[in-house]
UniProtKB/Swiss-Prot annotation:
Catalytic activity field: UDP-N-acetyl-alpha-D-muramoyl-L-alanine + D-glutamate + ATP = UDP-N-acetyl-alpha-D-muramoyl-L-alanyl-D-glutamate + ADP + phosphate + H(+)
Signal peptide range in chain numbering: none
SUPFAM superfamilies registered for this protein in UniProt: MurCD N-terminal domain (SSF51984), MurD-like peptide ligases, catalytic domain (SSF53623), MurD-like peptide ligases, peptide-binding domain (SSF53244)
UniProt pathway annotation: Cell wall biogenesis; peptidoglycan biosynthesis
Subcellular location(s) per record: Cytoplasm
Protein name: UDP-N-acetylmuramoylalanine--D-glutamate ligase
Similarity field: Belongs to the MurCDEF family.
Amino acid sequence: MSRVEGLTSWYSDWQGLSAAILGIGVSGFAAADSLRELGVDVTVYAPEKHTRYNKLLDAIGARYVCAYLDELCEVDVDFIVVSPGISPDNPVIKRLRDRQIPILSEIELAWRVRDKVNTCPWILITGTNGKTTTALLTGSMLAKDGARVAVCGNIGTPVLDAVRNPKGFDYLVVELSSFQLSLLPMHGNGAVKGFSSACVNLDEDHLEWHGAKELYYCAKSRVYHGTTGFCVYNLDDEETKKMVEQACVARNVRAIGFGLCVPDVGQVGIVDGILCDRAFLSARKDSALEITSVEKLEKNKLSMRHIISDVLCAVALARSVETNPLSISRALDEFCLSPHRTEVVAKEMGVMWVNDSKATNPHAVIASLSNFSRVILIFGGLMKGVDVSGIFDRFYETIKAVVVIGKNQSFVGNIKCKKIVCIPDSNDPMSEAVAAADLLATPGDTVLLSPGGSSFDQFESYEHRGNCFINAVKDLVKRK
């Protein structure tokens, strides 16, 4: 066993070790900062110069080397920390492993040093869609109940920053992407063990990175591995149930289902418009605990089907750590969705304009379309190797027309729709898409930006894409 494998605490002997951090960003810097605080000699390798991080790395005493990944096969260090953008199947990573160099992720490192201030339960959340919303919902419920909670991970705040917070936390709600999960070990001291774990839903995504649907699903399933308290799964998504059934977990772990249906014992669901818990109350065999109503959720724009599913998942996770139902209800009354998630931008001349730019895969588009009856769909972007035909087969009667954006529109041949308008690449593709949608729309229609792909071919981010849509719609309304 290497010396690194035996390091299971902030207070272990890290002094004098050397580490290479591959990639820089918020998680890479958090790793560098933490390791320097532990007395580790740190060198950060990244292919581009990041002026902001260069100065920060200098300040903490870490070195920065501008280098590409394939230049690092012979790096000589005690261990390596990789960014979540680097595949564990990368040839360089494989070669480094062959040299017996331990390779950690920021999440594994955070797990090893989680006791710096205090050791608290981790609530792990993943899914193809809705994981950020579910994490924020769960965090808000725990906080409303008086707990000190950090929502961290893929959502943006590094887990290492949370575990080093001098005040400590009662819970960490950790959002995990498939990239982050694929880097986590299944065994040993670095294997993360959540108290409660959930996969919100599952569908094809990031196939260009994982290589196959099965490998993507396998990465997601790791969220349940080692769970010590509760595995929360989606009753409307059979794959998540299979994951729980196949997971290696601690003894006496309970499986809790959630879904848009009347709940059975051990489940969270809906009865006559009331969200109910039949999983965590002692009299669950013959009664249910009321949490809130769909009517109340509607007042806070949380009543779309896929959002209610996220709410139910968060309710299950919050109840798994004994959060008071009244606190959960109050948190839901105050919760606001993040922008670019089925966000109503305008209602003009009987047409509703909806920004769902966060929908970066077909599963998210399907979830969004399920809420509307007649849609002009603005669709396209970097499709990440997934098949889009299922969307248009399933919603042929719902989708009145498709306005296609994106530089590569080769997928258009897989679209089955009554009307297709392709927007050529330009300096302002979104304004052209909005103008085209306006010509197609009639009273009673919804114009829905739900692209189904990443934004980076024409926009800086999904937020930028969504803001371009919002601005184009506002300009259109002004002209009318």
